[in-house]
Amino acid sequence: GEGFFDIHLHTCFPRLPNITRSNGTYYPSPEVLIQMMNSAGIAKAVVLSTLSPECRYTIVTPEETLQICNKYPDRLVPFCNFDPRYLTNSTKANFLPLLTAYKEAGFKGVGEYIPNIYLDDPLNMNFFGQVEEAGLPLTFHLAPQTGGYYGCVDDPGLPRLEKVLKSFPKLIFLGHSQVFWSEIGILKNPDERKGYPRGPIGREGRVVELMRKYPNLHGDLSAGSGFNAISRDPEFGYR
C-alpha cells in the first residue's frame, strides 16, 4: 500500500486532566494519533509500551497497547515490554512464558526498552537472551549516564552495544536516541552524545561500523536524533 510505516509511536487512553509531563505535554489519545498519522501520510505504525519508570509521567502497559491496536488493526502494530526487574528482580527471572503469551496475543516486538542501567547489566543480559529465544525484535533507547535520563547506558564508542550484539546474534536490535545516532560519525567530544551533532560526516562512526559488522543491528529513524543523523550530511545519510 501507499504511505509510510512509522516504527516508533506512543499513545494511551486519556489520563486525568492534570496528569501530564511538567511542561504540560502528554501522549495523544488513539483517535488523535490516527488523525496525526493521516495528516502525515503514515499508513501503519508500531505502538510502543513503556513500563520502566525513568522520566515517565504515566505507564503504558502492553495490555493497554493491545487494546488500542485492536481498535485500529489495519493501522497499528503492538509492541509489548518489560522492565528487567520484573518477576524476581534478579538474573534468574524467567520472562519466556510471558513473552510467549504476548507473542501469541499478537505482539510483534518489544519496546521501547528504557531502563536506566548499563546496557550489558546482567539483568539486561538475562532479558535479552529470552527475547532472542522468543523471536521478537527489540527497540531500545540509549542514555549517556545513569540519572537524569531514560534508556540503557553505554559509553562513547558504544562498547557495551557491541558486547550485546555479539552475545545475541539472532536478536534484532532497533537502535534509537541521540546517544545512538550521534555516533553515525566520529564524535568530536563525548558531549556530542547528548545532542544533535551538525555538519558533514568525514569518517564513518561506530553505528555504521557496528551495522556492517552485526546484521542484527538496525536503526530506528524516529524523532530528532534519527532525522538529524540522516539529514546532517544528506549524501552520506542516503548512501
Label every model-predicted segment.
Residues F13-N18, Y86-L87, G147-Y149, E183-I186:
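A short acidic, helix-capping loop that chelates divalent metal ions and anchors anionic groups
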Residues Y26-I34, Y57-I68, A93-P97, G157-E162, ...:
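Alpha-helical scaffolding within the catalytic cores
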Residues K44, S52-P156:
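Active-site gating/metal-coordination segments in enzymes
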Residues K108-G109, D121-R239:
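Catalytic pocket-lining loop regions of alpha/beta-barrel enzymes
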Residues G1-E63:
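An N-terminally biased module of ancient metal coordination in phosphate/nucleic-acid-related enzymes
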Residues F4-I7, V46-S49, F79-N81, G111, ...:
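Active-site neighborhood of phospho(di)ester-bond hydrolases with catalytic His/Asp-centered motifs
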Residues M37, C69-P73, K103, L165-K166, ...:
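N-terminal cationic-hydrophobic initiation segments that often serve targeting/anchoring roles
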Residues L16, L51, N116, V179, ...:
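Flexible, active-site-proximal loop/turn residues at the rims of small-molecule/cofactor binding pockets
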